[in-house]
């Protein structure tokens, strides 16, 4: 039982030593002085059998706090949502169980059709004309959008709101450095949204794009109409990073003038799973379509007039024209795009709207419940399913108290925004019940008054 997996047999070892012209493994370390070599047996436990190994790691895993053992109010970019049971059932089918789009699409019509439907649903949600077959995650989608804007406009200045997810801004910074793109951050106002007055002062004719998040990192809904006017008034593109579920109740960015809409499909059928893997989406206009990174599935007809699906506009991609490609990315997240596609299909258009509305309504109930307990809600702007609460103690201390009560608390904004020390970002999804929200309010009141 203990020796189920053997990297090499004694015969293998003898043959390797003979090939090397030595008689023992010790001779491989002849360059290391004898006096500093370790001799004897290592002070480590003996190998475990497979059942004992499984039991050991199960014991370690049970020490973790997770969504099954605790009530979760943590979001900040990764959320706990309902996943229809059909998602995993379909993902594990042999026809679909691959992480990649095929290079011989004519033999993978089912998978290509599923990805085509993914693109179609992304376009419906975002109000855009064309979408690709997915990106790695929301952060890389955002960074790729900025580089696409710089390449299309020929300008090297990008303005990004501080209300965009801090980790996404970090990825953007890495991309910008390599492409010699200047990044300028614009602050937020007292309402927790992008300061449009400061933005207008920063934008000039050398600006390639303005990037905002909708809803933003604090959960608040940005005024895309006002920002669109500022961007297009100076010839810049408007890029929005949007939670796709929120677009079930919010006006589509495309209808508000966005040129590129990106985001993370995690709310649809993709588990939190320690922060990844995820699936980014990327949507734009037909005018910008040939500048878009990633793979695109198109619909066509074969010589018999039957509908078929192909990978189209491949000359944009790295595996065709490396030096002239639109991006270094010529991959995608096909399996997770399929998960999102199945989840959206299972929910349906009305189901997505209802799920989004439940998030909005339950988050607003939570805000009112906390206010009734004397807790301070920082911003008054319209929000989706997250909001900021000011505490009178460090967030880590409060979260420790919540954990003892069986609750996973919010995100510590002070980690990324020094001005928001002792501020927590709470997320409330459709899975939270009235009773759970009431318990959160009572526990927060007790902890902050202790």
Swiss-Prot record:
Catalytic activity from the UniProt record: N(6)-[(R)-lipoyl]-L-lysyl-[glycine-cleavage complex H protein] + glycine + H(+) = N(6)-[(R)-S(8)-aminomethyldihydrolipoyl]-L-lysyl-[glycine-cleavage complex H protein] + CO2
E.C. numbers: 1.4.4.2
One annotated GO biological process: glycine decarboxylation via glycine cleavage system
KW Oxidoreductase (keyword) present: yes
Keyword flag Oxidoreductase: yes
CDD domains reported in the protein's UniProt record: GDC-P
InterPro entries: GcvPA, GDC-P_N, GDC_P, PyrdxlP-dep_Trfase, PyrdxlP-dep_Trfase_major, PyrdxlP-dep_Trfase_small
GO-annotated molecular function: glycine dehydrogenase (decarboxylating) activity
Function according to Swiss-Prot or TrEMBL: The glycine cleavage system catalyzes the degradation of glycine. The P protein binds the alpha-amino group of glycine through its pyridoxal phosphate cofactor; CO(2) is released and the remaining methylamine moiety is then transferred to the lipoamide cofactor of the H protein.
Family under the similarity heading: Belongs to the GcvP family. N-terminal subunit subfamily.
Stored PANTHER family: GLYCINE CLEAVAGE SYSTEM P-PROTEIN, GLYCINE DEHYDROGENASE (DECARBOXYLATING)
Protein name: Probable glycine dehydrogenase (decarboxylating) subunit 1
Organism of derivation: Brevibacillus brevis (strain 47 / JCM 6285 / NBRC 100599)
